[in-house]
């Protein structure tokens, strides 16, 4: 193990003032929401304004802060410069389908769209991304930094790869539009559609591609974007973290922080056999994590607490452990 380890805190994120997008992700149930809320609270202490977005369909932000959030940014109680919003992909899909039904006089297109929309693999991530796109220009100008509380690993990876996939797809569509546009327009007018609607559609696609290209560039810029991996000290979680790190590297998305949550630190005088057995197991996987990541990662160790971290006060208290290493009680 290297002697000059990187500091075991997330202070490096607070110090990097150029960061615009911060993602927190990992396996389900490892404390992603608590970590993202706590990080957002710490950022609010040193940045002008912070927006916390949940892209997890389970939406735990409302539970964590004990306050109802919606798809519109809402100020978090007890803070002047911290805002939160929860993106719901399912309702966004439903909205899109309803718009199609309104535009379609005989209703056939709408019902077909409904069947299609909910059957497409990855549609949740696509709609989450589309919802963020709606806010991206306005919000990124309004807020100095945006923190994402993401869905469990698989969803997150598809979500982060979506800009690249979409950029390529829209590029192909645009080239098809220039080749087949007149024919599509003719067919559309024969079927009762407006002749100009195809040109409008391709113009919209082209402008959307511009926005997506910009976001894609920002996501791949380590000065603008970073990903905080959250895990617990168990085999499956560590395995998933390694997979996440590999995938993020393949997508060229920066990651250099790992939060290891729910660690047991039993007192020496404790005679709890279960605690000591679990602690030995945790220490084994923690040693593996250090072996894998010490050279390039800040590894933050957080304890398993006796009570839930809920409400602004408890989250604020917990957030201090992200910037000051946890000291085990004697």
UniProtKB/Swiss-Prot annotation:
Q: Give the EC number.
A: 3.6.-.-
> What CDD domains does the record tag this protein with?
ArsA (cd02035)
**Active-site positions on this chain:** 56
Compartmental location:
Cytoplasm; Endoplasmic reticulum
Quick check: keyword Transmembrane helix in the entry? no
What does the entry list as the binding residues for ATP?
27-34, 234, 261
Q: What is the protein name given in its UniProt record? A: ATPase GET3
Which source organism?
Laccaria bicolor (strain S238N-H82 / ATCC MYA-4686)
């Amino acid at each position: 193990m290297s002697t000059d380890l990187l500091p075991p805190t997330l202070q490096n994120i607070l110090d990097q003032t150029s960061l615009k997008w911060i993602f927190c992700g990992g396996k389900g149930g490892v404390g992603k929401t608590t970590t993202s809320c706590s990080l957002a609270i710490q950022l609010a202490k040193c940045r002008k304004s912070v927006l916390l977005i949940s892209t997890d369909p389970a939406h735990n932000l409302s539970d964590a802060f004990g306050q109802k959030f919606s798809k519109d940014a809402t100020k978090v109680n007890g803070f002047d410069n911290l805002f939160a919003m929860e993106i719901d992909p399912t309702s966004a899909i439903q909205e899109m389908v309803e718009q199609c039904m309104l535009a379609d006089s005989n209703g056939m297109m709408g019902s077909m769209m409904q069947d299609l929309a909910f059957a497409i693999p990855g549609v949740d991530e696509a709609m989450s991304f589309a919802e963020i796109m709606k806010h991206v220009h306005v919000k990124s100008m309004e807020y100095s930094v945006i923190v994402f509380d993401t869905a469990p690993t698989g969803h997150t990876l598809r979500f982060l790869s979506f800009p690249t996939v979409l950029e390529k797809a829209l590029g192909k569509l645009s080239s098809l539009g220039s080749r087949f546009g007149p024919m599509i327009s003719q067919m559309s007018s024969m079927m009762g559609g407006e002749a100009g609607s195809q040109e409008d559609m391709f113009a919209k696609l082209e402008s959307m591609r511009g926005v997506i290209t910009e976001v894609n560039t920002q996501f791949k810029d380590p000065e603008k974007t970073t990903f905080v991996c959250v895990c617990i000290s168990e085999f499956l979680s560590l395995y998933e973290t390694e997979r996440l790190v590999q995938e993020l590297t393949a997508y060229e998305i920066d990651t250099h922080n790992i939060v290891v949550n729910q660690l047991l630190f039993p007192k020496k005088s404790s005679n709890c056999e279960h605690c000591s057995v679990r602690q030995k197991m945790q220490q084994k996987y923690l040693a593996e994590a250090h072996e894998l990541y010490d050279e390039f990662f800040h590894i933050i160790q957080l304890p398993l607490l006796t009570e839930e971290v809920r409400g602004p006060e408890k989250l604020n208290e917990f957030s201090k452990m992200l910037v000051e290493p946890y000291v085990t009680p004697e």
